[in-house]
C-alpha cells in the first residue's frame, strides 16, 4: 500500500476544503486548533496502471499549514510532519511520499535525527520525498515545451531558480548531460552551494535573480518566491517559458504577458481516472487524472515493488535514478503536463 502525506496551502483553504469534505468541526477553526489537530487519513485511493496492475493507497492530511512557519511555530511544524509519518507507518503503509512543504521541513529541520515519535520508531525506508520523479518530469516539460514552440534546446538559455536545492540541482544535471542546453544560468541564495554546483557541472553562469530572468528562454522555478519580488513581463524574452515547480503554484497569476507561457511544473497526468477528492483541493485542471509528481513517485514505487526511500537526503539525485523512475512513469501510464498554447 502507498501513502500520500500532504497539507493545504493556507488556513483559508483548509477551512474551505474541510467544509467541502464534511469535516465541519475543522471548518470554522483558527490556527491554534490546526496546530493541535492530529493527522487524519481522509482519502482511500485505487490506481490502475497502464499495465493493468491495481494498487491501493491512502491520503494522510498532516494538518500542517504554511502559516505555522510564518508565525515561527517551528516545533509545531516539525511535530506535524513526524506525526503524519508515524500515522502512516502505524497503518502499515509500505511507501509514503512527503508532499509539499513536508519534505522541506524534514530536510531543513534535520528530522532524520528525531526517529522516535512516542512509541513508534520511524523506519525511513518507508518514505520518499518524491523529488527524483519531480525533477525528471520538470526536465521532460522543458524538452517538450521547446519542441512545441520550435526552440532548439541546444541553443537555448535555461535559468534554474533554486538551482542548489534537491530538485534544482538534479534538473541542472539533466539539462546539462541529457539535453545539452545551450546556456545554463544558476540562481540561488547560498553562494557557496552555487560555486560547488558550478564546479560539479563544469559550466553554468551564476547570476542574481534580476539579472538571470531577462537572459532566459526557459525559467525553471523550484524555489519559494521571495517576498516583495515582482517580475516585470516586459523584461522577459518573447517567447519565454516559466516552469513553476514550486508549491503553491502562483507564477501564473503573477507573470502574464504576450509571449509569456507559464506551465505548472512537476505535475503529471495519468492515463486513467482516479476516484479521489484531494486533487480537487489542489486545484488541478483535471483532478481525476492530474497530480503532483512527488505523489506519483509513491505510486510508482508501489507498482514496481520498490519499497525504499528512493528519494532521500539532499542533492543525492542521480541521472541513473531519474532514468529509472522515468521509465517506470512511462510504463505505468503517467505523462508530464504539457504546455497549452
Swiss-Prot record:
It catalyses: a long-chain fatty aldehyde + holo-[ACP] + NADP(+) = a long-chain fatty acyl-[ACP] + NADPH + H(+); a long-chain fatty aldehyde + holo-[ACP] + NAD(+) = a long-chain fatty acyl-[ACP] + NADH + H(+). Signal peptide: none annotated. InterPro entries: AAR (IPR016836), NAD(P)-bd_dom_sf (IPR036291). PANTHER family: NADP-DEPENDENT 3-HYDROXY ACID DEHYDROGENASE YDFG, VERY-LONG-CHAIN 3-OXOOACYL-COA REDUCTASE. GO terms for molecular function: oxidoreductase activity. Catalyzes the NADP-dependent reduction of long-chain acyl-ACP to the corresponding fatty aldehyde. Involved in the biosynthesis of alkanes, mainly heptadecane and pentadecane, by producing the fatty aldehydes used by aldehyde decarbonylase. NCBIfam families: AcACP_reductase. Keywords: NAD, Oxidoreductase. This is Long-chain acyl-[acyl-carrier-protein] reductase. Its EC number is 1.2.1.80. Belongs to the short-chain dehydrogenases/reductases (SDR) family. Its cofactor is a divalent metal cation.
Amino acid at each position: 500500500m502507498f501513502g500520500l502525506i500532504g497539507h493545504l496551502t493556507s488556513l483559508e483553504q483548509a477551512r474551505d476544503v474541510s467544509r467541502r469534505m464534511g469535516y465541519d468541526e475543522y471548518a470554522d477553526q483558527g490556527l491554534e486548533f490546526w496546530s493541535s489537530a492530529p493527522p487524519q487519513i481522509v482519502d482511500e485511493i485505487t490506481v490502475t496502471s497502464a499495465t493493468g496492475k491495481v494498487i491501493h493507497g491512502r491520503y494522510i492530511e498532516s494538518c500542517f499549514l504554511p502559516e505555522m512557519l510564518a508565525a515561527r511555530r517551528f516545533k509545531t511544524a516539525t511535530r506535524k510532519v513526524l506525526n503524519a509519518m508515524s500515522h502512516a507507518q502505524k497503518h502499515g503503509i509500505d511507501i509514503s511520499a512527503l508532499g509539499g512543504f513536508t519534505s522541506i521541513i524534514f530536510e531543513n529541520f534535520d528530522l532524520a535525527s528525531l526517529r522516535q515519535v512516542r512509541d513508534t520508531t520511524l523506519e525511513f525506508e518507508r518514505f520518499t520525498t518524491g523529488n527524483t520523479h519531480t525533477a525528471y518530469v520538470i526536465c521532460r516539460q522543458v524538452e517538450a515545451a521547446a519542441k512545441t514552440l520550435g526552440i532548439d534546446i541546444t541553443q537555448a538559455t535555461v535559468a534554474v531558480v533554486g538551482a542548489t536545492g534537491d530538485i534544482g540541482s538534479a534538473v541542472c544535471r539533466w539539462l546539462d548531460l541529457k539535453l545539452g542546453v545551450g546556456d545554463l544560468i544558476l540562481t540561488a541564495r547560498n553562494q557557496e552551494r552555487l560555486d560547488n554546483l558550478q564546479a560539479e557541472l563544469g559550466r553554468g553562469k551564476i547570476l542574481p535573480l534580476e539579472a538571470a530572468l531577462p537572459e532566459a528562454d526557459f525559467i525553471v522555478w523550484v524555489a519559494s518566491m521571495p517576498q516583495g519580488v515582482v517580475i516585470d513581463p516586459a523584461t522577459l524574452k518573447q517567447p519565454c517559458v516559466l516552469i513553476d515547480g514550486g508549491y503553491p503554484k502562483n507564477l501564473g497569476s503573477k507573470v502574464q504577458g504576450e509571449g509569456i507561457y507559464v506551465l505548472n511544473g512537476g505535475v503529471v497526468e495519468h492515463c486513467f481516472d482516479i476516484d479521489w477528492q484531494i486533487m480537487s483541493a489542489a486545484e488541478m485542471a483535471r483532478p481525476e487524472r492530474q497530480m503532483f509528481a512527488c505523489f506519483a513517485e509513491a505510486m510508482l514505487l508501489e507498482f514496481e515493488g520498490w519499497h525504499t526511500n528512493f528519494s532521500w537526503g539532499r542533492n543525492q539525485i542521480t541521472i541513473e535514478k531519474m532514468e529509472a523512475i522515468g521509465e517506470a512513469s512511462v510504463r505505468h501510464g503517467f505523462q508530464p503536463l504539457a504546455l497549452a498554447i
